[in-house]
């Protein structure tokens, strides 16, 4: 099932800006390593002019969940929570899985 692992945040916590930049490089290196092995897409990062950010990788859900459930990835998540305001990590349905979700949602509406 195609999935996107998406991280959002508003800005670095004041006083931790330098460490947040180092953290961004660390996260990209971890996930780029897995992308080179064909386990996920290359990381993509987006910023607004106000500094809000979005970071994501895509891949098969079971593979992304397995990679996210490693000690190194769990530590990266904890660091993100300590360095970035409003840090949020979520898994999204993507590609055909998103279309399938919409069909299931439509079917579920019949019960309301």
Explain the meaning of each model-derived region:
Residues 1-52, 59-69, 91-112:
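Short S/T/G/P-rich N-terminal loop/turn motif that feeds into the first structured element of a domain
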Residues 86-87:
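Short, mixed-charge low-complexity intrinsically disordered segments
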Residues 57-83:
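Mid-chain, well-packed structural core segment of small domains
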């Amino acid at each position: 099932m195609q999935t996107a692992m998406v991280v959002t945040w508003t800005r670095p916590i004041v006083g931790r800006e330098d460490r947040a930049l180092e953290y961004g490089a660390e996260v990209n290196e971890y996930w780029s390593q897995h992308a080179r092995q064909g386990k996920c897409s290359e990381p993509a990062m987006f910023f607004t002019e106000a500094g809000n950010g979005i970071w994501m990788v895509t891949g098969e859900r079971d593979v992304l969940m397995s990679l996210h459930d490693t000690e190194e990835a769990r530590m990266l998540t904890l660091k993100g929570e300590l360095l970035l305001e409003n840090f949020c990590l979520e898994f999204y349905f993507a590609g055909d899985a998103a279309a399938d979700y919409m069909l299931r949602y439509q079917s579920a509406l019949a019960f309301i």
